[in-house]
Every structure is written in structure tokens, then in C-alpha cells.
Amino acid sequence: MEAVRFAVAVVLVFCYVTSSNAQMTSPPSGGAGGDAHSLPCIQKLMPCQPYLHLATPPPATCCMPLNEIVAKDATCLCAVFNNVDMLKSLNLTKENALDLPKACGAKADVSLCKTSAGTNSSSTPPATPKTPPASSTSTGTGSGSTGNAAPSTAKPTSSAPAINFGGLSFASAVVATLFF
């Protein structure tokens, strides 16, 4: 029984350390330009990270999600492309950030990103469907409600990783209570 308690304690400590490290690395990417809404799509691209600076062609595990994002999620593509801090953290520039899609045969149209003129504007398309309810609430300030819609859209998604890690901590506490 003592061995089981020790094993559970080790697992709980491991989960806590893992969630703490993930929380420490999450805010810089979310805080650098408000692109926290793009994190789910960034996570799909994690298999591509080793191939960012290699001449070796990336495998299908990298190219399939990358091609899907290029084809279907221009908002994510622009959020990454326009986030200079994120590119710097990966030792990329805007110019060589396009090398990976080319290696996968994807045609990334970054002219859409230039049209959106920045990371805050690139978050506007997802907020556009949510803007009419906000403007119907405050009819006199339609432009003010549009400005408020984008930050409110980014805040819930930026807190989503914290909720997930909070749930992990809560689950750890429940398991500890059951076994100890």
C-alpha cells in the first residue's frame, strides 16, 4: 500500500510540474499581440517544429495539418505570420516562415494577412458574427462595440489553457484526497 501511495504522489508531482511549466510558457505567446485564439491551431503544427530550420522535407505528420490550416484557417495563418514575437521565439523571420509551407506544397497566401494589417485586425473576422448582438445592445456606439468585441473574444480563449490546467490541479487534488 505504501508503494501505491508513493507512486500516486510521484504522478501528482509530475502533473503539477508539467502544468506549472505549461502555464509559465503560455502567457508570453498569448500576451505578445493578443493571439491566444490561435493557440489551438499552433498546437496542430507542433510536429513541424523540428523541420523549421532543416533542409529535410517535412513528413506527412507535419504537412497534413499545415496544408489544412493554410487551406481552411487564414486567421490562424495570419495570427502566426503577423506575430513578430512568436516568429522571433522560433528564430524565424516573415520571409523564412514561408519556407515550411512551400516544402509541404502549400500555397500560403499572406497577402490576406497584409490586407488585415496586423494581429488585432486578423482577430476581427471571428468577432464579426458576434458583433451584431453587441451592437444591438448598445445601438448608439456601434463602432465602440466592435472594438470591445475583439478583446472579449480573445480573453475567454486566452484563459482556456488556465482552465484546463486548473482542472488538472483540481483532478490531482481529488486523487490525492482519495488515496491519502
UniProtKB/Swiss-Prot annotation:
Result of knocking out the encoding gene: Inability to limit tetrazolium salt uptake in seeds, development of hair-like structures on seeds, altered pollen morphologies, deformed or collapsed, and decreased levels of omega-hydroxy fatty acids in seed coats.
InterPro entries: Bifun_inhib/LTP/seed_sf, Bifunc_inhib/LTP/seed_store, LTSS
Leader peptide range in chain numbering: 1-22
Residue stretches of biased makeup (Low complexity): 116-125, 133-156
Disulfide bonding pattern of the chain: 41-78, 48-62, 63-104, 76-113
Glycan-modified residues: 91, 120
Tissues expressing this chain: Restricted to stamen, pollen and sporophytic tissues. Also detected, at low levels, in stems and leaves.
Sequence segments annotated as region (Disordered): 116-156
Organism domain of life: Eukaryota
Location of the protein in the cell: Cell membrane
Gene3D superfamilies referenced in this protein's UniProt entry, alphabetically: Plant lipid-transfer and hydrophobic proteins
A biological process from GO: proteolysis
Keywords, sorted A to Z: Cell membrane, Disulfide bond, Glycoprotein, GPI-anchor, Hydrolase, Lipoprotein, Membrane, Protease, Signal
Lipid-anchored residues (GPI-anchor amidated serine): 158
Hydrolase keyword on record: yes
Propeptide boundaries: 159-180
PANTHER family in UniProt: BIFUNCTIONAL INHIBITOR/LIPID-TRANSFER PROTEIN/SEED STORAGE 2S ALBUMIN SUPERFAMILY PROTEIN-RELATED
Biological role: Lipid transfer protein involved in seed and ovule maturation and development, probably by regulating the fatty acids homeostasis during suberin and sporopollenin biosynthesis or deposition.
Protein name: Non-specific lipid transfer protein GPI-anchored 3
Organism for this UniProt entry: Arabidopsis thaliana
Encoding gene per record: LTPG3
